[in-house]
């Protein structure tokens, strides 16, 4: 046998071994619903976007029912800047007036959503782009936040404008799609309970969708490895009580707090497990779901 043939055989054997090791994980997720919140740096990199799309298609063709929820903060910011509209934030959320919500809806439900649909279809899948307004899937109520004035130390209620939080989720549309070789891709734009449109934080939106569907897993793709301890080391597993303790002692702080709170919310709504993970790693979704140890922080009840 020549060296080149031997190398080809060895490579084929390695690929077969990888598939064999992935088999029990595929069986575990067979016919299960997995909600993936897609955002962060990975969305702005075409190569990582293609890897993500391949992961989602492979999951669907392996018997999993994936649901993709995407963000788009940087893209919204870029469009607002292009139009000469200044972005303002409070408590980590974009203040959204009437002019801004129209642009947010256009960017999220139009441009970004269709780009992701295109990548998935290019990878061999059959993706359908939707938003929370379709079929009244997600109805939202007005979100409010309180901030503490640094000088007076008095709490103030901030009006975020057309920013909402999920109030009800109707899964009828998704129930008709899942299990039919179709992959729903959802933009976090929702109908207001009192009429109109609300922009919803993508993590919060994904948590509400996962809870309503009774998902086996909710994956939150971020720009960090997961939840880190005080030495900046990854914590591989946490419970709800441990998460609350880490928030209370300041280990979990800043932008990680709302992500962990979303995890707790989803778990209390019935999701089996939630993972905060690094979406910048190529094929991060497969590495998390189809390997023995995963790559992020798994949070369970």
From Swiss-Prot:
Q: Does the keyword Transferase apply?
A: yes
Which keywords does the record carry?
Answer: Amino-acid biosynthesis, Arginine biosynthesis, ATP-binding, Cytoplasm, Kinase, Nucleotide-binding, Transferase
Name the residues that bind substrate.
72-73, 94, 199
Site-annotated residues for Transition state stabilizer = 37, 259
Asked if the record carries the keyword Cytoplasm, the reply is yes
The enzyme's main class, written as a single word, is transferase
Which reaction is recorded as catalysed by this protein?
N-acetyl-L-glutamate + ATP = N-acetyl-L-glutamyl 5-phosphate + ADP
Q: Where in the cell is it found?
A: Cytoplasm
What is the superkingdom listed in this entry's lineage?
Bacteria
The UniProt entry's GO CC annotations, sorted and at most eight, read: cytoplasm
What Gene3D superfamilies does the entry give? Acetylglutamate kinase-like
Record-stated family? Belongs to the acetylglutamate kinase family. ArgB subfamily.
Q: What is this protein called?
A: Acetylglutamate kinase
Native source species: Azorhizobium caulinodans (strain ATCC 43989 / DSM 5975 / JCM 20966 / LMG 6465 / NBRC 14845 / NCIMB 13405 / ORS 571)
Gene that specifies this protein:
argB
